[in-house]
Amino acid sequence: MAAGVKAAELRELSEEELVTKLREAKAELFNLRVQAATGQLDNNRRLQVIRREIARIYTIMRERELGLSAAPTEVTAG
């Protein structure tokens, strides 16, 4: 995953893509925590970046649930 995904970029994704990103971020966070526990983690900052990315994804999902923002709609040419 890219370091520090912006909220504007995440808002352009569909619900399925957000769920996929969330799953990937959680898996990466788990791996980073294992590395930290075993003393193999090189970049401690990456833990915070991933945690914030997860929080951004949850926030966008909640905004859509409450109707504060809408999921992007597909525009068909024609």
Curated annotation (Swiss-Prot):
GO molecular function terms here? Answer: structural constituent of ribosome
Name of the protein: Large ribosomal subunit protein uL29
InterPro entries from the xrefs?
Ribosomal_protein_uL29 (IPR050063), Ribosomal_uL29 (IPR001854), Ribosomal_uL29_sf (IPR036049)
| GO biological process assignments | translation
TM region positions: none
What organism does the UniProt record list as the source?
Salinispora tropica (strain ATCC BAA-916 / DSM 44818 / JCM 13857 / NBRC 105044 / CNB-440)
- UniProt-listed SUPFAM superfamilies: Ribosomal protein L29 (L29p)
Which keywords belong to this entry?
Ribonucleoprotein, Ribosomal protein
Disulfide bonds listed in the record: none
Pfam families assigned: Ribosomal_L29 (PF00831)
The reply to whether Isomerase figures as a keyword in the UniProt entry is no
* Gene Ontology cellular component terms for the protein in this record: cytosolic large ribosomal subunit
Q: Indicate the family of this protein.
A: Belongs to the universal ribosomal protein uL29 family.
